[in-house]
């Protein structure tokens, strides 16, 4: 399979890319250091799965997700983040993200997530679901 990895922290991006390339079913891992570079790579390279960080320079992972779903809807998208912010998660789900998971996971778990989304299923970290279920969004006085 062909993957795109968009992560602005170079050490993390390089390490994750190397670990993914060791997997027997991974053919290539394209690397992008920001959202703009990710979109440029997607315009010239066919990928099966895009693995995106949320907060990146120029274009966020959420911006890239929305671009992919509009221009290359066959590409599966996994958001990998440290942020448990409900607003990010809600925007990603609204944009039809295939998986939204936390960075505190092993390569084996990430590979399971990749295979899950390639099989047409969704995956969301339980910790994120818990935040969503307990997130209070009170109405303003005007509402």
Predicted regions span which residues?
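The feature encodes the CheY-like receiver
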Residues: 57
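Two-component signal transduction core modules
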Residues: 50, 77, 100-101
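Short amphipathic alpha-helix used as the core "switch/output" element in two-component signaling
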Residues: 62-73, 94
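Active-site residues of response regulator receiver
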Residues: 53, 81
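Conserved acidic carboxylate
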Residues: 7
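Short, flexible helix-to-coil linker/hinge segments that flank and couple to helix-turn-helix
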Residues: 87-93, 98, 102-143
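Acidic catalytic/metal-coordinating carboxylates
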Residues: 34, 60-63
């Amino acid at each position: 399979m062909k993957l795109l990895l968009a992560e602005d922290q170079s050490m993390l991006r390089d390490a994750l890319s190397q670990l993914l390339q060791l997997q027997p079913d991974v053919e290539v891992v394209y690397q992008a250091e920001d959202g703009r570079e990710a979109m440029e790579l997607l315009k010239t390279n066919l990928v099966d799965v895009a693995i995106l960080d949320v907060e990146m320079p120029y274009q966020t992972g959420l911006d890239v997700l929305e671009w992919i779903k509009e221009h290359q809807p066959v590409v599966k998208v996994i958001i990998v983040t440290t942020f448990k912010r409900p607003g990010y998660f809600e925007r990603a789900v609204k944009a039809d993200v295939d998986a939204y998971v936390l960075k505190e996971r092993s390569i084996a778990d990430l590979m399971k997530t990749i295979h899950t989304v390639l099989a047409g299923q969704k995956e969301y970290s339980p910790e994120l679901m818990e935040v969503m279920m307990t997130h209070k969004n009170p109405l303003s006085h005007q509402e």
